[in-house]
Amino acid sequence: MKRLGADFYQMPTILLAERLLGKIFVHHEVSGRVTKGRIVETEAYLGDGDEACHAWRGMTERNHVMFGPPGHLYIYFSYGCHYLANIVSEQKGIAGAVLLRAMEPIEGIEWMQERRGTTDERALMSGPGKLTQALGLGPAHYGESLLGDICWLEEAPDIPPELIGTSPRIGISRSTDLLWRKFIAGSPYISKTQPGPPPKKRKKGLESS
């Protein structure tokens, strides 16, 4: 399949959250292993006015990659237990990223099962922490370009608007009224968590992207 180029990522974050649905995420590891997942669920985060976004108070050493250029990975450690992956959007200098919330396993499923400790394909990538574990993504991929030979996206037809579901984002306690979670309606691979704030015992952690 043809790889997506730089122009694809230079669009408004909310639009990118929709356009990413159906696209194929590829991780080509140094070992030669290749894992692929079809994106079925995303969430948009914007630095301007979105208090659930890591960049809403400005640039820091931690979030600087969110300010561009677009088409790079923003990886962070969440709630002390999971690495989450975001794709940087917008024009350079404007903070924005799309959280990859869930995928459908496509290739390298045996390695995903080994990493995740389950043979249930629907559970391999049905959450943002699950998919990074399945794909083998971690802190080493912070700032990784999606135009290189390690991680990239492959083209796939856009999902028709009538098949795109929308809801509030999951696991956040601020800016909860924004309907910036996008997903392929009816997909058995989307996350099962209900929109809304995280459980009280997890409030010491960081918000999603």
From Swiss-Prot:
In this chain, composition skew of type Basic residues spans: 199-209
- InterPro entries assigned to the protein according to its UniProt record, in alphabetical order: Formyl_transferase-like_C_sf (IPR011034), MPG (IPR003180), MPG_sf (IPR036995)
* Taxonomy, superkingdom: Bacteria
A GO BP entry is: base-excision repair
Q: Which keywords are on file for this protein? A: DNA damage, DNA repair, Hydrolase
Q: Where are the residues of the annotated region Disordered?
A: 189-209
- The EC number on file is 3.2.2.-
Tell me a Gene Ontology molecular-function term this record carries: DNA binding
Which Gene3D superfamilies does this one have?
A: Methylpurine-DNA glycosylase (MPG) (3.10.300.10)
Q: Name one Pfam family in it.
A: Pur_DNA_glyco
**NCBIfam families named in the record:** 3mg, PRK00802.1-3
**Family indicated by similarity:** Belongs to the DNA glycosylase MPG family.
Q: What is this protein called?
A: Putative 3-methyladenine DNA glycosylase
